[in-house]
Amino acid sequence: LVGSEMCIRDRKNMQEWLADQLVSVEVVERLESKIDGTNKFVFRLQDGNVIESVFMPYKHGNSVCISSQAGCRMGCRFCASTLMGLARNLTASEMLDQIYAITRIMGQRVSNVVVMGTGEPLDNYDNLCRFIRMLTDENGLHISQRNITVSSCGLVPQIYDLADEGFAITFALSL
């Protein structure tokens, strides 16, 4: 430490150490496509629930698709997430931890985030909004809101609430 401020090297070491200590997801399976470099991650949460995330490399930057719930209660016929029912909502930190874990494993920066993995994001509204604020914070990953997409099966009251938040995100409606 130099005076009351940490030197840059100490700050970087501290951030890496904290990231290793605080991640609440454990990789239980990783599948890599030999065709395009896509990686599917199966994570176990601290309570034993399992979720999935996907890393997708593109020329314009890397995208990650994350889960917002362990399971889902929406019952969409086109989606496998509903088969196990809803176990629980993920916290904002658990959503963020999927990105931190993938970034650390892949050794590459994530520039785009899609909330379209396991679960219905708008059914976990408060944690979704908290996650977006944390993700875009300049002291965190500082990902632009314009690089975030939220996909929903269409919970109308929450769609209006999300619009009122003033986020500059992309909203996708799954039909």
Predicted segments with their positions:
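Extended basic (Lys/Arg/His-rich) segments that typically form rRNA-contacting surfaces
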Residues: 9-13
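A broad, low-specificity signal for short, low-complexity segments enriched in glycine/proline
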Residues: 4, 14-15, 131-135
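Short, small-residue-biased leader/transition segments that mark boundaries at the very start
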Residues: 1-7
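Conserved Radical SAM active-site core
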Residues: 53-169
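Long amphipathic N-terminal alpha/beta scaffold segment
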Residues: 14-59
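Short gly/ser-rich anion-binding loops that grip negatively charged ligand groups
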Residues: 8, 28-31, 62-65
